[in-house]
Design a protein with these regions (language model features):
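An N-terminal domain-cap segment
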Residues: 2-51
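Short, contiguous alpha-helical
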Residues: 41-80, 130-179
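Internal, conserved structured core segments that host functional sites
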Residues: 94-147
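Glycine/small-residue-rich hydrophobic helix-like segments
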Residues: 189-226
Length: 263
């Protein structure tokens, strides 16, 4: 008899909305404190400068409001946990859209406009609203979970590139960690390896003998930020192991062939 299909993780919609709003606010305040030299630095993401990365983060909120302004789609095609695998082909399109939407205005103005627009749009719609998106139609509730990934990942990018110290909202960090952990389990289903990302997530993955009790024979453990960097291609498996940011035990506890999940 095949194993029962795992029920998708549930997220508290009110907490996710609050986390997205709070993290965007953290970034807006942090960007406002960056000086010209910091804004001119390379972001580490292709040819983008830190200023262009900051503008892209403003576009994340701006595009959410724009999506909610369009007529709704009929039914969702994509869930939150499937979203990481649908993003790679759209990188160029998203970059171009961000440039067109945000060109010509100073960053403080971009953030004020985008934040206000996002707040109005979220107040007007419930989580059941289905957005018509390039990557596939999604409910607003699911799409907001993916916004925690975008915001947390790019906040970390900004901090590293600009030498900033923009805080990560705990609920946003938790949702980002959990979504990317669940995406790993979706990509490599099974129960032979236990991946622990305390204090937010534990998942089992990879086909093979299933662990049932006691200490699992194959364990991977790391912290949330290292996991997020691994899952999004900001660092690689070998480097994380060498720097002791990942602990892996057991002959199957090698995730290098599965990472990054998105880049």
């Amino acid at each position: 008899m095949p194993p029962a299909k795992k029920k998708p993780r549930a997220y508290d919609p009110a907490k996710i909305r609050a986390a997205v709003t709070a993290q965007f606010g953290h970034v807006a305040r942090g960007v406002a404190e960056l000086g010209p030299e910091q804004l001119a630095r390379p972001s580490g993401l292709g040819a983008w400068t830190v200023a262009e990365l900051a503008a892209h983060i403003a576009w994340i909120a701006d595009s959410l409001a724009a999506g909610l302004a369009r007529p709704p789609a009929a039914v969702p095609e994509l869930t939150a946990v499937e979203w990481p695998f649908a993003t790679a082909s759209l990188a160029g399109k998203i970059s171009e859209a961000a440039r067109e939407t945000l060109a010509g205005a100073p960053l403080p103005e971009l953030y004020e406009r985008a934040g206000a627009g996002m707040a109005r749009a979220l107040e007007a719609h419930t989580g059941a609203r289905v957005l018509d998106l390039w990557i596939g139609d999604m409910t607003l509730a699911d799409f907001l979970v993916t916004r925690t990934v975008e915001l947390v990942v790019h906040t970390d990018d900004l901090n590293r590139a600009a030498g900033a110290d923009i805080p990560l909202e705990r609920q946003a960090l938790a949702a980002c960690t959990r979504l990317l952990a669940d995406a790993l389990a979706l990509k490599a289903p099974g129960g032979s390896v236990e991946v622990r990302i305390p204090p937010f997530a534990v998942v089992q993955c990879i086909e093979g003998p299933r662990h049932t009790r006691g200490t699992p024979p194959n364990v991977v453990e790391t912290d949330p930020l290292t996991w997020i960097r691994l899952a999004t291609g900001r660092t690689d498996w070998a480097a994380a192991l060498d720097e002791a940011r990942v602990r892996a035990s057991g002959e199957r506890a090698d995730l290098s062939a599965l990472l990054p999940l998105m880049s």
